[in-house]
Design a protein with these regions (language model features):
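Charge-dense, helix-prone N-terminal extensions
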Residues: 1-118
Length: 118
């Protein structure tokens, strides 16, 4: 997968936007959640293989790291909740698309997981 193909895939999600808040080296994909821009994907703009960081359920994150050499702890991110995926071809396209959607859904549904105090 090329960077333009990955960008197209990420920007197809509803209300997703591309930003560069950390400089030109990192493309950050965000979605509006109740008026706040929340990150769901980051892509390193330089180097090969492409590095894609995605939010992930903590238990699934560990399973993916154990199963795939190309799935690492999130680079410069909360390692419990983020994975960095090296796009080497080890993951099938449909699995990669599923992980992107999983990340996006975790971000937009996050308020449903916040504990409430009564």
């Amino acid at each position: 997968m090329t960077r333009p193909e990955l960008e197209k895939l990420l920007l197809q999600l509803p209300n997703s936007k591309l930003d560069y808040p950390f400089g030109e080296e990192v493309a950050v994909y965000k979605v509006d959640v109740d008026g706040e821009q929340k990150m769901f994907a980051l892509v390193q703009e330089q180097g090969e293989p492409i590095r894609l960081s995605l939010k992930c359920d903590p238990q699934l994150a560990v399973l993916l790291r154990e199963k795939y050499e190309s799935v690492l702890e999130g680079y410069h991110l909360n390692k419990k909740h983020w994975n960095t995926i090296l796009l080497t071809g080890q993951l099938e396209l449909d699995e990669l698309q599923g992980l992107i959607l999983h990340s996006y859904n975790l971000v937009i549904d996050n308020k449903a997981h916040v504990p409430t105090t009564d």
